[in-house]
Amino acid sequence: MRRTRTPLPKTQSPATLLGVMRRATSKSLFIRQLLQSGRAPCVLLLLLVILPACTPRVAIRPRVPTFAQLIAQLSEEGGYFPSDNLISNELGYQKVLQKLDELNVRGGVYIGVGPEQNFTYIAAVRPTYAFILDIRRENRLQHLFYKALFVLARHRAEYLAMWLGRPLREPSDRWAHASVADLVRLMETTPPDSDYVRMTLERVSATIERRFGVPLTPEDRRSIAYIAQSFSEHGLDIRYESHFRRSWRQFPTLRQLLLETDLTGRPRNFLATEESFQFLKRLQEQDRIIPVTGDFAGPKALRAIGDYIRSLGETVSVFYVSNVEYYLLQNDTFAAFAENVKTLPRTERSLIIRSYVGYGISHPEALPGYFITTLLQRMNEFIRLYEAGEYRTYWDVGLLDYIPVR
């Protein structure tokens, strides 16, 4: 009867595999005796079964998503909001920065909402990651536009020139260390240039698709073009507008927002110093500022952001909510939002930054000439008051607990 040999893996010759097995089993008397008895095929079959089970397992690291994959992974369907929100309408946004410094709120992960004011808070807190969560899909596109500008610009002057569609007529390096007031004056005396805007849009779109890996639909391109052309048309005079009414006079222009200061009179906008701008530029280049589409009270986005932060071994340092809570209370979805906040990884130092619009009820922290009051609150205190059933109205949210900043 002809003996059939056990087939071996094609990647190794019988002699090679047998030699490996002899070395691996030299301390096993039983297997050594089998090898010496001429029963090598049986030994080969035995070891092919046993050795994989005895081999130490190597931990497989989870696959890190790309920037584009992470956006898609965290986002929900977009929703409607009755304004374009091309710029902030919160003039007093810097008034809490000195208190953030005093409380030593640094690092961790930042979560925010809305357009450019987030960059000032990120520059102040210096987080490892930042997530911008907004119900409007257009906000995500606007932050992709900003991300491309950060990547393309070498310094603040080039960034501001591309943002406002006003090309620099002199060597741009001259403005690398200018004050924000100098940069504002430069833009005031530089006319918009439609060819420059068109060229910038081409570079921005190419950067978003080729470098960031985010595909743009024709509608996306139109939305980004609308953003760029709005800033080019209005320049430093652009301000927040609602779809249902003309801009309120108390809403600040971009010029005012850029020149605003903290309580000590120090300009703290993200374009106030080259060092702050370069920090943001590095974060953007490292894909660490991630725009996400979703509802604060939705079933997925905020919780998914929290899960991702937890997977990084990080906690939330600051959650900037603007005045979104007002709309959540109007829509009877505030409880769902609070339940989402409860799932975020946090510490006793984690803070909420909110914008309080009194609607007839002034806040003790309100400043003369400022329509909106910016407030700080411990995230744990927010959760405690919510669980105690204390938040019945919007005014409860703003007035029951806050950290004095003055």
Where are these regions (language model features)?
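Conserved class I S-adenosyl-L-methionine
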Residues: V105-G114
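Bacterial N-terminal signal peptides that target proteins for export
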Residues: A24-V43
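Alpha-helical subdomain
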Residues: G235-R406
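Conserved SAM-binding loop of SAM-dependent methyltransferases across substrates and taxa
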Residues: F119-V125
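C-terminal motif of bacterial Sec signal peptides marking the signal peptidase cleavage site
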Residues: P52-A53
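Mature N-terminal segment immediately following signal peptide/propeptide cleavage
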Residues: R61-E102
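Class I S-adenosyl-L-methionine-dependent methyltransferase module
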Residues: F131-I290, E387-A388, R392-R406
